[in-house]
Regions:
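Catalytic grooves of carbohydrate-active enzymes
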Residues: 10-19, 25-38, 122-133, 186-299
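Metal-dependent polysaccharide deacetylase catalytic core of the NodB/CE4 family, i.e.
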Residues: 48-139, 195-226, 252-265, 374-375, ...
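Acidic-aromatic substrate-binding/catalytic surfaces of carbohydrate-active enzymes
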Residues: 339-421
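Acidic, contiguous internal or C-terminal segments within carbohydrate-active enzymes
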Residues: 420-466
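Beta-strand-rich recognition/accessory modules
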Residues: 230-235, 239, 259-261, 472-511
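Acidic-and-aromatic substrate-binding clefts and catalytic sites of carbohydrate-active enzymes
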Residues: 16-25, 45-57, 78-82, 136-145, ...
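Catalytic domains of cell-wall/extracellular-matrix polysaccharide-remodeling enzymes
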Residues: 109-183, 440-445
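Active-site beta->alpha N-cap acidic-glycine motif
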Residues: 1-69, 255-260, 329-331
Length: 511
């Protein structure tokens, strides 16, 4: 039986100086009422200062609903730093500064990260008499996660969704959804094998739209938000479509969606969305379309079933927006990829390699800037490499009447009855194309009765050269390759590589 896991994760801050009028206790009380009403097993993650000075430990000791879980939201604040004997990297006069160098562990030296973890764990233990299974933040570096695994044996962690620039956090190119065992050298990437991984499942948060979040336009605060966050998602239709996209066509063992909201938005702003989402979640559970598990229990399930990160696919056949697009995601411990359909056209909009030689920027040194970046190794980067609003997507071209044209496909089908593979077939006047995503490769075959090729847009700052059996790239000093087969020849322009398919052969990429 394939698992359809939902985790309700509410995280709790003591205060937010940007909105002093917010009642931070009210959202927790109201969320707790709804969770108790539906008897959901939820997870509550507290900032360290919320445990120190807030009413929350006493509240939870008194009123925590049965089956609920307490854990730590490891954002750093001034009070937390004082308890740890560490210098706070935030602005003068504030307790919590959301900027990367202040609120994330990456803003502190390794010895300071240890002190911050120790202080938080000690305070949690003093308040509740045990150590938590679940510790999360918008981003936790691999060194800190490794320490939490080795000393405190946590069973689950989580980080922010895939996004570029939002709130100054660019967490991009990694495992797009679900969970993975992080690399010991880069928390944004899965470990390639048991020796190179931290054995703590890391879950992606916030319930992103698999169709529209990836290429959501950039604004002053980074990308827009196309997620399940209750302050943004108040439409039951949008939520139902998300659930059908995430859970309706499972090609791999499981899927995962996180619900919940931090208290610092205030109850009036989140009320309508939160009430609606809990009601819709209850309906989905009653219909067997989802099940609710705490973050810690989700981690225990993952640990008991997988020694290494398993593949995870998302088949999103419905677009909540009028454009009517479709999207397909495939993640493995070696790469991630996303295929998109617009009208009669198919294109690969994303392909990132996961190579454990690629170390995260803040593994040994600290972040000194307001904005952080955690990324992967790009091969296809449809969003960030776009020009004049045109995505830099990889496309198929077929020879038709003496010229190269993008083929059109009228019908599309997905085979989900496979063993952790994602197989897509589309047919039209130019023939039939087959895409197959497996743990270690991407296969493309066009049955058109005519020559065909692949057009791969490249970034000259990253692309190095094309050979019949491999593509070579370099990003942030890391040289990496994508293997090729089924190619009869290559050509290069200023903006793209042309890969000519050998007659009668399928083309394989080996990230």
């Amino acid at each position: 039986m394939k698992k359809k896991i939902c985790s309700i994760i509410n995280f709790i801050r003591l205060e937010d100086h940007r909105m002093p009028e917010i009642d931070h206790l009210e959202p927790v009380m109201e969320q707790m009422k709804l969770i108790g009403k539906y008897r959901f097993p939820a997870t509550w993650l507290m900032q360290t200062d919320a445990m120190l000075e807030g009413p929350y430990p006493e509240l939870f000791q008194r009123e925590l609903p049965e089956g609920n879980e307490l854990g730590i939201w490891l954002e750093i604040t001034r009070l937390h730093c004082e308890a740890a004997g560490v210098e706070f990297r935030g602005r003068d006069g504030v307790n919590w500064d959301h900027h990367s160098q202040a609120s994330l562990t990456i803003g502190y030296r390794r010895s300071e990260r240890i002190a911050l973890v120790e202080a938080s764990m000690k305070i949690f233990h003093e308040k509740f008499g045990y150590y938590p299974r679940s510790v999360a933040a918008w981003y936790l570096d691999a060194f800190t996660l490794g320490y939490l695994e080795e000393k405190y044996h946590i069973t689950a962690t989580a980080n922010c969704r895939d996004q570029w620039g939002t709130d100054g956090y660019s967490i991009w190119g990694g495992f797009w959804a679900g969970a993975y065992y992080p690399s010991r050298g880069n928390a944004n990437l899965p470990g390639e094998d048991e020796s190179g991984q931290i054995r703590v499942p890391l879950f992606r948060m916030l319930g992103s739209c698999p169709v529209n979040q990836y290429d959501s336009s950039l604004g002053e605060n980074g990308q827009g938000v196309c997620t399940l966050e209750p302050t943004a998602c108040k439409d039951p239709r949008w939520m139902k479509i998300l659930f059908r996209n995430m859970f309706g066509n499972l090609a791999t063992d499981y899927s995962y969606v996180q619900l919940g909201q931090e208290n610092s938005f205030g109850w009036p702003r989140m009320k309508d969305g939160y009430v609606m989402q809990m009601e819709e979640l209850a309906k989905a559970c009653a219909a067997g379309e989802a099940e609710v598990m705490t973050m810690g229990d989700s981690g225990e399930w993952f640990l008991s079933n997988y020694r290494v990160t398993p593949p995870l696919a998302t088949v999103a056949l419905e677009d909540p927006e009028p454009a009517g697009r479709q999207a397909f995601w495939y993640n493995s411990r070696y790469y991630r990829a996303s295929l998109t359909r617009r009208g009669k056209h198919l294109a690969l909009r994303d392909l990132h390699c996961f190579d454990n030689r690629y170390r995260e920027t803040y593994l040994e040194s600290r972040c000194h800037t307001h904005a952080m970046i955690a990324d992967a190794l790009p091969v296809v980067e449809g969003f960030l490499w776009q020009k004049n609003g045109v995505p830099a997507e990889m496309k198929i071209e077929v020879q038709d009447s003496g010229s190269w044209k993008e083929p059109e496909f009228d019908t599309l089908s997905v085979d989900t009855a496979t063993d952790n593979r994602l197989e897509i077939m589309a047919s039209g006047k130019n023939g039939t194309v087959f895409w197959c995503f497996t743990e270690s490769s991407v296969m493309i075959r066009l049955d058109a009765g005519a020559p065909w090729r692949i057009l791969l847009p490249v970034n000259p700052e990253v692309f190095r050269r094309a050979e019949p059996e491999k593509l070579v790239f370099e990003h942030n000093g890391c040289v990496y390759e994508t293997g090729l087969s089924g190619i009869s020849g290559t050509d290069e322009t200023e903006t793209a590589v042309l890969l000519e398919a050998a007659s009668g052969k399928a083309v394989h990429f080996y990230p």
